[in-house]
Amino acid sequence: MLKPTAYLASAVAVVVVCLSSYSAPASAGNDGVVRLKSVYPIGETISRLKNDIAAKGIVFFSEVDQSQLAAGAGITLRPSVLLTFGNPPLGTQFITSNPNAGLDWPVRLLVFESEKGEVWTAYTDFGWIARRHGIKNRTAQFKMATEVIASITSAVTKK
């Protein structure tokens, strides 16, 4: 088992790597969802996001192809893929503050194609998650998570 200082060092290392390609975080709508348009086709968007996650040393947990699941149920759905990933030394701190925060961790990043054929990414704003779960003692960690997701999504929002 790692000591708390080792966890902190791991979290700081991930943030340092992430901030090297940092761009300002996007703002969420009233529903707490941040939506960002990708400049790449869906397959390349997913590949770029996964590569950026790996390059930052963040743990990639799963890729759920929702349109494939829908097809298996006889339902037509435009391309829609859910990526889950995270940095346990950072993310689990939120759950220690409120176990219900486990509903929002690991991080979920949706990549989908709109009716117009545009590719979008969407994720839940971390400030909104903090308010949802009444977590007030992890401000620095929520800021860090916001900076990390902004860095990851910047891999697909500009060429």
What label would you give each PLM region?
Residues 26-57:
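Terminal, regulation- and interaction-focused segments at domain boundaries
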Residues 50, 54-107, 111:
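Compact, glycine-rich, soluble single-domain proteins
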